From Swiss-Prot:
Expression across tissues: Expressed specifically in roots, pollen grains and pollen tubes.
Primary localisation category: Golgi
Name by which UniProt lists this protein: ADP-ribosylation factor GTPase-activating protein AGD10
Phenotype of gene-disrupted mutants: Plants are arrested during endosperm development and have altered root hair development and pollen tube elongation.
GO cellular component term of the entry, any: Golgi apparatus
Zinc finger C4-type: from-to: 25-48
SUPFAM superfamilies, per database record: ArfGap/RecO-like zinc finger (SSF57863)
């Protein structure tokens, strides 16, 4: 594809540069221009191409005829343009060869000329897509000699043939729309009230009324044996029905409405366990009966007791331990304070040798406090006794 464009570029520029008008620069008349403005289809020298490039590509798009690659549309712009055609067009709008370049190519005339070239190139491209020969510009505006009058006349004849053929093709669409609308109009009936009802033409036979209506099929519940046989014949997607009997027993209303009340008074005496989606009552064993008798005995035994210990309840009462505890408590019945050493039998009065001075002082101070408190208690008791004696004497 690139080689074809290159060959087209070389052949096109060879033909265009063979003309005398294209051998000089469009702006400064310098010889052998190697640059061109694609926007206006004119040939320029390297100095004028720099001026056009400074204007911006939106005003003038400049490319080299030797170094740059050209597309087919760009080559058509050069074919439909040319220095001679552009010079004639600009002179019609009062622009001569001299003058400011920027003002010239930003004028209204330059904009119109650019639009004319773009339209001609687009038209030729559309004709090529339709496999028609491209239509060159008018003979009055084409001084380049690339097209002839015969081709334009042939093109006009082809256009007239197209216009003659068009009226025959246009009425096809309304005919189709009319044929489509006919069924819609046929549905409208004024006599039937707009509901579209139609009278029956065929009478129904009288035997239809004598026929007995079909009885509804009653689906009977299958037994477990028949369910198993049917399940064996079904495919694997019916394997979920393994517990059919259990599900029927669970869904039956007898399980909910006829629950027998518990015979014993205990709440946790009857154990329930889940088996296949239903609760089953566990039979009462001999051990549970023994527990019931024991609880009755305990109730009779401790009816009037205010407190019950675990040792008394389970029969593990140790009388010797109770006696020792009671005897140890009797020793401290009159004392106001009891130390752990005195309670557990370690209060022999001898201090261990490994005590520090601080611990020794603490113990001595604690013993002194206990002695002082005991003396205070004795003094209070004697005071009370003396007061009672004195009151009895005065009376």
């Amino acid at each position: 594809m690139a080689s074809e464009n290159l060959n087209d570029k070389i052949s096109v520029f060879k033909k265009l540069k063979a003309k005398s008008d294209n051998k000089i620069c469009f702006d400064c008349n310098a010889k052998n221009p190697t640059w061109a403005s694609v926007t206006y289809g004119i040939f320029l020298c390297i100095d004028c191409s720099a001026v056009h490039r400074s204007l911006g590509v939106h005003i003038s798009f400049v490319r080299s005829t030797n170094l740059d690659s050209w597309s087919s549309e760009q080559l058509k712009m050069m074919i439909y343009g040319g220095n001679n055609r552009a010079q004639v067009f600009f002179k019609q709008y009062g622009w001569s060869d001299g003058g400011k370049t920027e003002a010239k190519y930003t004028s209204r005339a330059a904009d119109l000329y650019k639009q004319i070239l773009a339209k001609e190139v687009a038209k030729s491209k559309a004709e090529e897509e339709l496999d028609l020969p491209p239509s060159p510009p008018d003979s009055t505006q084409v001084p380049n000699g690339l097209s002839s009058i015969k081709t334009s006349e042939a093109l006009k004849e082809s256009n007239t043939l197209k216009q003659q053929e068009k009226p025959d093709v246009v009425p096809v669409s309304p005919r189709i729309s009319r044929s489509v609308k006919k069924p819609l109009g046929a549905k409208k009936t004024g006599k039937t009230g707009g509901l579209g009802a139609r009278k029956l033409t065929t009478k129904s036979s009288g035997t239809l009324y004598d026929q007995k209506p079909e009885e509804s099929v009653i689906i009977q519940a299958t037994s477990p044996v028949s369910a198993k046989s049917a399940r064996s014949s079904f495919s694997s997607r019916f394997d979920y029905a393994d517990n059919v009997q259990n599900r029927e027993d669970y869904m039956s209303p007898q399980v909910v409405s006829h629950v027998a009340p518990p015979k014993s008074s205990g709440f946790f005496e009857e154990e329930l366990e889940m088996n296949g989606g239903r609760f089953q009552k566990k039979p009462i064993t001999s051990s549970s009966k023994l527990q019931i008798q024991e609880t009755d005995e305990a109730r009779k035994k401790f009816t009037n007791a205010k407190s019950i210990s675990s040792a008394q309840y389970f029969g593990n009462d140790n009388n010797s331990a109770d006696l020792e505890a009671k005897s140890s408590l009797k020793k401290f019945s009159g004392s106001s304070a009891i130390s752990s050493a005195d309670l557990f039998g370690d209060g022999d009065g001898d201090f261990p040798l490994d005590l520090t001075a601080g611990d020794l002082l603490n113990r001595l101070s604690l013993q002194a406090q206990q002695d002082i408190s005991s003396l205070k208690n004795m003094a209070e008791e004697t005071k009370k006794k003396l007061g009672s004696v004195a009151s009895s004497l005065w009376v």
